[in-house]
Amino acid sequence: MQILLANPRGFCAGVDRAISIVENALAIYGAPIYVRHEVVHNRYVVDSLRERGAIFIEQISEVPDGAILIFSAHGVSQAVRNEAKSRDLTVFDATCPLVTKVHMEVARASRRGEESILIGHAGHPEVEGTMGQYSNPEGGMYLVESPDDVWKLTVKNEEKLSFMTQTTLSVDDTSDVIDALRKRFPKIVGPRKDDICYATTNRQEAVRALAEQAEVVLVVGSKNSSNSNRLAELAQRMGKRAFLIDDATDIQEEWVKEAKCVGVTAGASAPDILVQNVVARLQQLGGGEAIPLEGREENIVFEVPKELRVDIREVD
């Protein structure tokens, strides 16, 4: 059995930054550190940080006065931000800068009283945070997930209308929704630069290349990870058997025992150690040396807040 590795795969710059913020805060301030929502959607990462003293909460009311609070990489609404400001808390923001970019687009539309449409998945924390940047009652903020949603949508003023997208969507699906928006509302204005982030786009491109060669595709990522789910869906659409797994223990031998080529990739919130463990398990099942495919090089780095820029070795 041949093992192929998608490239790029795994951690993106926003996830790296968010995890570093929690790790550095723990090193500097000590446990406990409170984090609103899972800092990134990966069980291994969250469990590791929890063992070191991070406490993951959903409501600001769960955080005691005087504590350290970190917002997750997915971002928060203005209401959550204001609630935290009203408390005696030290707050650090791990929102991915590419999510913050979308927040700024929504806030700008809100200030102008222009209606905005967000393409995204209802209930996802990034969507809740982005929708929560809009506050102008003279305008309006709407969520759509599919072309059908677009055709059912009515707005107050089609002349002043903009759209944004969640950063972790399927590129192909989003293109279909944008096409519907432009047909339904010919004067709608989109972002100057695509809101779907570079890491989402690159990983979907990489899994497409992987699925062209592999019979079975294993996507390392947690079930609540939007970008990881999109990778598995894309491979399935290409006619391949694709499975979303948290780690190597999820692999079922019957998935791969007849396969001549198995592809492995990882969502943007999955650490490489999990990929290494998956490769090791596949090798136990008869796989050869893992061969990385060529792909786009990623060298983007997002800095942590200056108060947390410290070499953890100096703190230990």
UniProtKB/Swiss-Prot annotation:
Pathway: Isoprenoid biosynthesis; dimethylallyl diphosphate biosynthesis; dimethylallyl diphosphate from (2E)-4-hydroxy-3-methylbutenyl diphosphate: step 1/1; Isoprenoid biosynthesis; isopentenyl diphosphate biosynthesis via DXP pathway; isopentenyl diphosphate from 1-deoxy-D-xylulose 5-phosphate: step 6/6. It catalyses: isopentenyl diphosphate + 2 oxidized [2Fe-2S]-[ferredoxin] + H2O = (2E)-4-hydroxy-3-methylbut-2-enyl diphosphate + 2 reduced [2Fe-2S]-[ferredoxin] + 2 H(+); dimethylallyl diphosphate + 2 oxidized [2Fe-2S]-[ferredoxin] + H2O = (2E)-4-hydroxy-3-methylbut-2-enyl diphosphate + 2 reduced [2Fe-2S]-[ferredoxin] + 2 H(+). Its EC number is 1.17.7.4. The active site is at E126. Pfam families: LYTB. GO terms for molecular function: 4 iron, 4 sulfur cluster binding; 4-hydroxy-3-methylbut-2-enyl diphosphate reductase activity; metal ion binding. GO terms for biological process: dimethylallyl diphosphate biosynthetic process; isopentenyl diphosphate biosynthetic process, methylerythritol 4-phosphate pathway; terpenoid biosynthetic process. Dimethylallyl diphosphate binds at H41, H74, H124, S225, S226, N227, S269. (2E)-4-hydroxy-3-methylbut-2-enyl diphosphate binds at H41, H74, H124, T167, S225, S226, N227, S269. Belongs to the IspH family. This is 4-hydroxy-3-methylbut-2-enyl diphosphate reductase.
